[in-house]
Amino acid sequence: MRLKDKIGIVTAAGSGMGRAGAVRFAKEGAKVAVVDLDGARVDSAVKEITAAGGKAIGITADLREDANARRIVRETANEFGGLDFVWNHLGHPGPASVEGIDMADFALAVDLNLRSQIVTTEAALPELKARGGGSLLYTASTSGLQGSQFSPVYSAVKFGVVGFARALAKRVAKDGVRVNVICPGATDTPMLRVFVARPDQQSTQGRDPEELVAQRAGQNPMGRPARPEEIANAALFLISDEASFITGAALPVDGGTTA
């Protein structure tokens, strides 16, 4: 087992890539805190993990609140006796347009994609250092590696995630903490359907979300969306000791989109 007896947190783990990751990590021997805003999804993911013989707790939390971003670390460490890794997977597409920008949606994109992850990191670092090191993983996007004309705000915050992680990697390497970023391309999740059909994206109004998903996914060289499990596989590698000499990396898992 690649994560035997490791203790970790996965945010936005109620569905999609986050859930696939939490389930996979538990199968590899980790004790996992499943964090999501949706309590029903949290319960469902925990049941899936425990039914397969894994160990998990569920934490329902709105990570826009700094106190909650810290609480998930405290509750995980108290329940399992420490912390070895965090996958900061939470995200929000934000506004599609800068013209007439919805500033509340802009603030939400910053809070969920960047601020909450920094606050969770602040809380997690002492726990990781106390165990001699660990792994921090962040979800950015291909939009955090190359600008997206359809999502300038999303690109901005995801570039911020990549920049933060790379800088932090240099700062905490001496403490045995590795810091990496995973950059998915179009992935077959509920989030993708929200992303392609945002109400302020004029070109998509009135179109079938499934048609939009197929169109977006077909733009990569492999001609299909990623499966959540494929993103989880890459996350597992970066979190595990198999990536023991990898830090400060931003790994595209995108079917060749950024090649």
Where are these regions (language model features)?
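Residue(s) in the substrate-gating loop at a strand-loop-helix junction
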Residues: 141
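Substrate-binding pocket helix/loop in short-chain dehydrogenase/reductase
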Residues: 97-98, 102-110, 216
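Short, small/polar-rich loop/turn modules that mediate ligand/substrate recognition or access, typified
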Residues: 87, 173, 178, 246-248
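Alpha-helical segment proximal to the catalytic Tyr-Lys
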Residues: 126, 170-171, 244
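Active-site helix of classical SDR
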Residues: 121, 157, 165
